[in-house]
Swiss-Prot record:
Catalysed reaction equations from the record: CMP + ATP = CDP + ADP; dCMP + ATP = dCDP + ADP
GO molecular function: ATP binding; CMP kinase activity; dCMP kinase activity
Single Gene Ontology BP annotation: pyrimidine nucleotide metabolic process
E.C. number(s) listed in UniProt: 2.7.4.25
Natural source organism: Methanobrevibacter smithii (strain ATCC 35061 / DSM 861 / OCM 144 / PS)
Keywords tagged on the record: ATP-binding, Cytoplasm, Kinase, Nucleotide-binding, Transferase
Entries under InterPro entries matching the protein: Cyt_kin_arch, Cytidylate_kinase_dom, P-loop_NTPase
Designated name of the protein: Cytidylate kinase
Main location: cytoplasm
Gene Ontology annotations for the cellular component aspect, listed alphabetically: cytoplasm
Family statement drawn from the similarity comment of this UniProt entry: Belongs to the cytidylate kinase family. Type 2 subfamily.
Length: 172
């Protein structure tokens, strides 16, 4: 079983993917972990590699390629990343969402910054990513038609979200 978990910053994609991995007993790989591995391969810090990636479209393409290869070579896998659903044949494609204020609050707590700073950073990052995804892959990240299940994570705690997904898996 291949599952993709996507969503914007602060929606709980990593938490959800980790819980699903634990409940289902199948591995979980995040696009972030692939990114960190690529930075290490280049002998760069994550920050240095992030700056390098901003001007090098091939980094995004390589992350997508590696996720697709992992999915093809795995019988059971959970892939977490904003674009995972676009590059992987999956049994279930999830999209998690939450209001901007909620996401900013979560990120402010996680990263020890003010809610206002977190909110501004989210807006800048998401605008930049939306343009990059459109430019590099011709993907409109706001079009959610590709997803099988969308969950507003503001409405449920992580355990409840996991139960919703596990229930969905029983009927597909």
């Amino acid at each position: 079983m291949i599952i993709t978990v996507g969503g914007l910053a602060g929606t709980g994609t990593t938490t959800t993917a980790e819980l699903l991995s634990e409940k289902l007993g199948i591995p979980f790989v995040s696009s972030g972990s692939i990114f960190r591995a690529m930075a290490e391969e280049k002998g760069m810090s994550v920050l240095e590699f992030s700056e390098f990636a901003e001007s090098n479209d091939n980094i995004d393409k390589e992350i997508d390629k590696r996720q697709a290869e992992l999915a093809k070579s795995s019988e059971n896998l959970i892939l977490e990343g904003r674009l995972s659903a676009y590059f992987v044949e999956a049994d279930l494609k999830l999209w998690l969402m939450a209001p901007l204020d909620v996401r900013a609050q979560r990120i402010s707590q996680r990263e020890s910054k003010s809610v206002d700073v977190a909110k501004e950073e989210i807006k800048i990052r998401e605008e930049s990513e939306a343009l990059r995804y459109l430019d590099i892959h011709n993907i409109d990240i706001s079009n959610l038609d590709i997803y099988d299940l969308m969950i507003n994570t503001d409405s449920f705690d992580p355990e409840s979200i996991t139960k919703i997904i596990l229930t969905t898996l029983k009927v597909i």
